[in-house]
């Protein structure tokens, strides 16, 4: 029996909060992709589980991720989200970090084939107190990725 999109979202956010890479990655197809705005793309269940346990939970704790107003048509799903965590980065250890965005889900056979965020990254960069030159590098990588997307071709004239 396939899960509903709402059930996928509930399991997704609970697994993130618990740091349960196996449960999280099981929501994805074998060749699934998690495209994180900061950590980049992770391909396949093993890499996705490692991203959650080895990146998210290395750099943060006490995660809360809530999804709102989900919509889907069986092949594509969207949900607005609010996300927060206590930062473990040494220069701001313990600081509560807040994010706001939309999750974009490509679905196949009741599983996530591709997940990516459309997040308000400016506010996040400010909260993380990323130094100026590093900010330029981080945002530059985001821009490079955006401009490499063929969907932007007509806009690059």
Language-model-derived ranges and their functions:
Residues 4, 56-157:
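A beta-strand edge to alpha-helix "cap/lid" segment located at domain peripheries
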Residues 12, 28, 34, 39, ...:
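Aromatic side chains
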Residues 19, 44, 101-103:
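Glycine-centered flexibility sites
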């Amino acid at each position: 029996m396939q899960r509903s999109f709402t059930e996928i979202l509930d399991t997704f956010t609970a697994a993130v909060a618990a740091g349960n890479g196996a449960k999280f990655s099981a929501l994805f197809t074998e060749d699934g992709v998690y495209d994180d705005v900061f950590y980049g793309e992770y391909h396949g269940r093993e890499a996705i589980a490692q991203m959650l346990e080895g990146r998210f939970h290395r750099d943060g704790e006490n995660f809360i991720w809530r999804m709102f107003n989900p919509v889907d048509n069986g092949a594509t799903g969207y949900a607005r989200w609010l996300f927060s965590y206590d930062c473990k980065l040494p220069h701001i250890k313990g600081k509560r970090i807040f994010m706001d965005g939309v999750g974009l889900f490509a679905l196949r056979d009741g599983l996530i084939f591709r997940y990516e965020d459309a997040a308000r990254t400016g506010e996040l960069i400010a909260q993380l107190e990323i130094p100026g030159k590093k900010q330029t590098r981080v945002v530059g990588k985001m821009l490079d990725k955006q401009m490499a997307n063929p969907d932007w071709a007509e806009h690059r004239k």
